[in-house]
From Swiss-Prot:
This is Transcription factor BHLH062. The keyword Coiled coil applies. It comes from the Eukaryota. It comes from Oryza sativa subsp. japonica (Rice). The keyword DNA-binding applies. It is found in: Nucleus. GO terms for cellular component: nucleus. Transcription factor that plays a positive role in salt stress tolerance. Interacts with TIFY11A/JAZ9 and binds to the promoter of some potassium ion transporter genes to regulate potassium homeostasis during salt stress. GO terms for molecular function: DNA binding; protein dimerization activity. Belongs to the bHLH protein family. Residues 1-26, 200-265 are annotated as: Disordered. Residues 49-85 are annotated as: Helix-loop-helix motif.
Amino acid sequence: MVPRDRVNAAAAGGGGEGRLVQSGIVNKKCDKKAPKRIHKSEREKLKRDKQNDLFNELGNLLEPDRQNNGKACVLGETTRILKDLLSQVESLRKENSSLKNESHYVALERNELHDDNSMLRTEILELQNELRTRMEGNPVWSHVNTRPALRVPYPTTGVFPVQHLPHLPVTTTAAFPQQLPVIIEQHYAATPRELQLFPESATSEDSEPSQEHGISDHVTRPQPRYPTPTATLPVNLFPVFPGRQDQQCSSGTSGTNEEDRIGRS
């Protein structure tokens, strides 16, 4: 066993070394210079100077040309500007929410339009296929579709051929939707030839122009010619009754007899 004396000696030796270490640390702290204590009034003065500098900078940022640069004016102006900015922020938030809703609605409408376009395209393709099948099944359809469209020119004149009645003037008028001028075409009946009841008078008439070429001393009296009413008027214009037919014949013979007498005189 270790004797008590040695243990006590070791403990005494260890305590001496600890004291030496602590004494060395204390000496190092004492070597540094202690800072000067700042007075409370000086600290307050530094704070006020710093605040004044900050207020001056804020006043210059708000209104550089302002005459009154007091702290109260600067604080009031800053609070007013902050309120305006906050109100603008709120209005912008509301506008942003409304724009988001509108954009969502527009996106839905766009999708609906895309769906409608796709449906219309499918319907068009179905109709084209159906038309193609009908054209292939029915040759008449293909002939009609392949045949070029005939262009009917509009007539330059407004007169159409009309079957004319005998011995009657015919007027034809035609008016188109384009308000073409009305053209009237009149066809006059040919003058009826006189009945040659006396061939001798006809030969004498033929001989008169031949005598005009030469000078003749004998002057003949001209013979008047009066055409009968039946000769000038067309036969089919007025109906002839059987009772009046004899009267017309008798009047015609009497008229010819009078002409004969006048010619002989």
